[in-house]
Regions:
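Residue-level recognition of oxygen-bearing side chains
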Residues: 15, 37, 65
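Non-catalytic, surface beta->alpha helical segment in thiol-disulfide oxidoreductase systems
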Residues: 55-71
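Structural micro-motif
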Residues: 45-53, 63-64
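Conserved beta-strand scaffold positions in the cores of enzyme catalytic domains, especially
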Residues: 27-29, 59
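Short alpha-helical
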Residues: 11, 36-37, 61
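Local sequence-structure signature of Cys/Sec-based thiol-disulfide redox active-site neighborhoods
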Residues: 1-25
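Thioredoxin-like thiol-disulfide oxidoreductase module
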Residues: 31-47
């Protein structure tokens, strides 16, 4: 299962979600606008930008990395 960490004002987050939807890939969205625990977790992993996308335990990265991963 894919998990995507997002913020409402993030254009690349919307693009990543659209890409997953176009590929008919199910995902869970975690909004950093509302989940401080998730924000702390990503910070501890030194992830400073959104989106951050995971396929299970595998950290894919952001939108560009997701696009490459799916190609």
């Amino acid at each position: 299962m894919y998990t995507i960490y997002t913020q409402n004002s993030c254009g690349y987050c919307h693009m990543a979600k659209n890409l997953l939807n176009e590929q008919k890939i199910d995902f869970i969205e975690v909004s950093l606008d509302h989940d401080q625990g998730a924000r702390r977790m990503l910070k501890s992993m030194e992830c400073r930008t959104v989106p951050q996308i995971f396929n299970g335990e595998l950290h894919i990265g952001g939108y560009t990395e997701l696009k490459q991963y799916l190609d």
